[in-house]
């Protein structure tokens, strides 16, 4: 804040008094710019300076009992942050045209993340990865492998700017989601959030539309029946993934506004796809997947609540 202009007259006239007794005290106030993520919003916490964890690396409750040692690798693959990070890293690298390298990637990450997988388990992981690579995605109806043949980005990091002058309007966010059938219960913390950060696992283009794909290693159970579309939808509600998906699509919405001269959300936003990897099985092709598309007016409304015009 700038101080008021000084009076003229060299300090000797009647109009000039002792500044120590009459001048107002001018103070400059600095409001910190804080950053948050989807996971931090759910914890009602602000991440100060430490690097953001990818959303998949945030620990979630794993209540299902352990599978028998001889069960399918989908159910015996280790749970937790490190195994999830390792699987995401492999999925970022593999493509149909580098099939001969998959085993090398698995062995490398098995050592790096200290997963302790035996050679027979790595064999099973290769078969599992093949099922994932060739499964049909729920919105675009192409395979994951095919989605990597055209324009795409893996691990696409983004930062959403919000209005620096006011606190993030948590009640408005809750009301916006409730009005569209996805009630949230975020706590109204009066935080001055300047940035929301995140990372999209896989962003790709198909037939002129842009799709968001997110991988989940959540363990929902030890049988195919635990990964039906109905159970996937329930799990997404339990973990507030509707919010995560919406933030991802707002980020894509803002990106395309700057890249496409003829951008039209109804024409270019292709939808959001979630793969619950432990449920991907050719014997049960409908399992482990969930996809939908928010209406353009929902994304535009959330964008306004986040303060895009003032950001």
Predicted features along the sequence, with ranges:
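Structural signature of nuclease core domains in nucleic-acid processing machines
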Residues: 1-311
């Amino acid at each position: 804040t700038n101080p008021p202009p000084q009076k003229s007259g060299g300090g000797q006239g009647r109009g000039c008094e002792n500044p120590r007794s009459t001048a107002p005290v001018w103070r400059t106030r600095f409001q910190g710019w804080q950053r948050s993520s989807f996971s931090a919003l759910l914890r009602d916490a602000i991440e100060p300076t430490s690097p953001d964890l990818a959303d998949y690396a945030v620990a979630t409750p794993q209540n299902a009992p352990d599978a028998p040692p001889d069960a399918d690798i989908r159910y015996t693959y280790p749970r937790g942050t490190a195994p999830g990070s390792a699987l995401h890293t492999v999925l970022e690298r593999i493509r149909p045209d580098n099939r001969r390298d998959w085993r090398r990637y698995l062995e490398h990450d098995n050592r790096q993340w200290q997963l302790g997988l035996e050679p027979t388990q790595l064999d099973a992981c290769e078969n599992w990865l093949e099922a994932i690579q060739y499964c049909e995605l729920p919105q675009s109806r192409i395979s994951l492998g095919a989605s990597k043949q055209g324009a795409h980005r893996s691990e696409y990091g983004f930062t959403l700017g919000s209005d620096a002058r006011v606190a993030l309007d948590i009640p408005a966010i809750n009301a916006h989601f409730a009005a569209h059938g996805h009630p949230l219960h975020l706590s109204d913390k009066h935080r001055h959030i300047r940035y929301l950060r995140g990372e999209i696992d896989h962003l790709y283009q198909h037939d002129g539309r842009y799709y968001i794909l997110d991988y989940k290693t959540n363990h929902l159970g030890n049988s195919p029946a635990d990964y039906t579309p109905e159970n996937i939808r329930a799990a997404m509600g339990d973990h507030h993934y509707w919010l995560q998906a919406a933030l991802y699509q707002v980020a894509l919405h803002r990106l395309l506004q700057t890249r496409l001269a003829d951008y039209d959300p109804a024409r270019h936003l292709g939808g959001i796809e979630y793969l619950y990897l432990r449920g991907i099985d050719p014997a049960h092709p409908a399992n482990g997947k969930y996809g939908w598309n928010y209406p353009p007016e929902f994304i535009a409304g959330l964008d306004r609540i986040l303060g895009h015009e003032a950001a």
